[in-house]
Amino acid sequence: TIIPWLKDRVNMVLFSQTIRTTGIPESKLIEVISSPIKSDHDCEIGYYPSIFGVDIRISSKRKENIQSLQNQITALLGKTVFALGDDSIEEIVVKKALENEISLSIAESCTGGLIGHRITQISGSSKIFKGGVVVYSNSSKVNLLGVGENCINEYGAVSEETAKEMAERVRVMFSSELGLSITGIAGPSGGSKEKPVGLTYIGLSTKQQTKVQKFQFGSIRSSNKLRASQAALNWMRLEVSNV
């Protein structure tokens, strides 16, 4: 009956661990770990997706079982795992930047300062975050940041070339080790066939090189800003962690 089962559950001491991931959809995550993981691990696995990623929660009566399964899952998921426990991705960025003494600066367009806001929510960020600029209009990209007017005229504000210049310019402006830029079409209007709503470019510049990644998010403005900020922070995490 249900009553003895409930009594057992009430008196049971459960251990748990959370594995935080980002940049991988829930369906893909389950596909990656379900086949290699055997079913006799005596643990319960729960998946909790959000706009920022997927949290995996492992629960068991035996702590050693959790540790074993955690090691297997983190090995399978690799770089998509950003934390064990409750730390946010911005907490990890600040922690790793402090550990490795890497200073940061950010030039934001479509996210409107959200990335800088998330970083400065973390205590100690003032030691590594040199500053940021919100260059929302084309004129501010040119006049404030120093992006070439020819670059914007030829390729557009939302382009790999503009994101590259933005990242390089902001790094030099603040004399930081790492400069990050983001430019995109948040929506719901402003898109085209060639450049649809949700198209976003993120640039990352160091003294050695500048790289740009292209992302295609959805059609909802608020979601696009959150997802874009998470993608930017994740790339920053990988860079400051020397992964």
Regions found by a protein language model. Name each.
Residues V10-V13, F52-V54, T74-A75, L145-V147:
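Short acidic (Asp/Glu) and glycine-rich catalytic loops that position anionic groups and cofactors
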Residues T1-F52, S59-I66:
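Accessory alpha-helical/coil subdomains and C-terminal extensions
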Residues E64-V243:
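Short alpha-helical segments enriched in small residues
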Residues V13-F15, H41, F52-V54, F129-K130, ...:
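A generic structural signal for well-ordered coil/turn residues at beta-strand boundaries
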